[in-house]
């Protein structure tokens, strides 16, 4: 995909990311509009985290920095996993106590007695969105400096030759991967927002907290 074509497509993705940022900001309202619990604060902070990831993702897509964009995608998947962890943990009070004391969430257990490791949360979250596993593994490969980095910098030449880009303008070959990264980020932001919406819609506690009080 040419850079010109990429620019045309990425502008639409960026517009969608900005819409999700507003949705994440609006999602804070029912959790923090008045008295709030640790449960509310945990979910509200997840919104803040997602907004900052969007703030980072947009310039990375604009500058065509696939390595950094993929790491931000991995972080967005992590935000979904940690949000979901609150709903599947065996002991909510212990979970929140551990989180707010900067403890290890992965040492706690879910309702089936299994530790809340990233691998376990990835598996559980795949029940909501089956694309999670593949996206997580791809993004993690770039986070942890694996062969995925070589793929991102390689340029196919003639007669089975391969060139490598060291510090120059990013290859056009990564443009399609960047677009996919943007689309997936939107997908997982929507997943995060859906989880929050289910909480708000299922609990009467939030009925009169959806609009900011004057």
Locate each region found by the language model.
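A cross-kingdom marker of C-terminal helix-rich interaction/assembly modules
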Residues: 1-67, 71-73, 78-86, 92-214
């Amino acid at each position: 995909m040419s850079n010109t074509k990429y620019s045309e497509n990425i502008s639409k993705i960026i517009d969608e990311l900005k819409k999700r940022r507003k949705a994440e900001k609006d999602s804070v309202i029912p959790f923090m509009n008045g008295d709030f619990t640790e449960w509310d604060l945990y979910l509200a902070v997840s919104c803040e985290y997602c907004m900052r990831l969007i703030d980072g993702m947009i310039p990375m897509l604009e500058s065509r920095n696939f390595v950094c964009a993929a790491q931000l995608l991995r972080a967005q998947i992590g935000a979904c996993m940690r949000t979901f962890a609150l709903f599947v943990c065996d002991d909510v009070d212990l979970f929140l106590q551990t989180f707010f004391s900067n403890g290890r969430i992965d040492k706690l257990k879910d309702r089936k007695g299994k530790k809340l490791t990233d691998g376990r949360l990835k598996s559980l979250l795949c029940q909501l969105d089956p694309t999670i596993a593949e996206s997580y593994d791809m993004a993690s490969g770039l986070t942890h400096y694996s062969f995925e980095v070589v793929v991102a910098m390689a340029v196919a030449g003639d007669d089975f030759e391969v060139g490598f880009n060291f510090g120059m303008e990013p290859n056009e070959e990564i443009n399609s991967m960047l677009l996919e990264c943007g689309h997936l980020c939107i997908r997982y932001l929507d997943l995060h927002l859906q989880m929050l919406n289910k909480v708000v819609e299922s609990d009467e506690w939030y009925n009169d907290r959806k609009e900011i009080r004057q």
